[in-house]
Amino acid sequence: MVVVAVSGQPGSGKTTIAREIARVLKVPLVSSGTLFREMATKMGIDFLEFHKYAESNPEIDKSVDTAAVERAKAGNVVLEGHLTAWVVRPYADVCIYLKASPEVRARRVALRDGKSLEEAYREVTEREELNRRRYLAIYGIDIKDLSIFDLVVDTSFLSVNDAVRISVDFTCTTLSFKYSKKVC
């Protein structure tokens, strides 16, 4: 019953890494960010504005996190999201945190979302601060405390392939030792 949690900063490569780990392990990927985006779209609210809205409506985060915990308890899943690893740590075999400089993350988000570099920079830094405040208020979790993670990867100067290789190799090695058999 393999459970891998991938968390990190906006634009750090969480979804890319989590998707590849899920592919290698042949398990589903559950993305908290996708669920959060879907909720914003249903309410007709801009994604960044929805983050602000969620700050005064903790039930939004709690519903997303409850879904993540339920999937983790069921096992055989890769979970991805900003807070995911902290929430599912008791059930996770491996927790990975991805980070990158604000400039690099802004460049990635600008390319991914078709935004200006300035707009993307504002978004990644503002989202990170909104997330930090929200998670501290709702759960008492400081997302700057990375002590729960088995692996922390700075993706600033890594190619996508290198970041994936490091994360997948670590995950496969850890799971093979934990379960005393080749997992990947």
Curated annotation (Swiss-Prot):
Predominant location category: cytoplasm
GO biological processes: pyrimidine nucleotide metabolic process
Source organism, top-level taxon: Archaea
InterPro entries xrefs: Cyt_kin_arch (IPR011892), Cytidylate_kinase_dom (IPR011994), P-loop_NTPase (IPR027417)
CDD domains registered for this protein in UniProt: CMPK
Binding site for ATP: G8, Q9, P10, G11, S12, G13, K14, T15, T16
Pfam families per record: Cytidylate_kin2 (PF13189)
A GO molecular-function descriptor: CMP kinase activity
Root EC class: transferase
TM regions (residue ranges): none
Family membership: Belongs to the cytidylate kinase family. Type 2 subfamily.
Protein name stated in the entry: Cytidylate kinase
Species of the source: Pyrobaculum arsenaticum (strain DSM 13514 / JCM 11321 / PZ6)
Taxonomy of the source species: Archaea, Thermoproteota, Thermoprotei, Thermoproteales, Thermoproteaceae
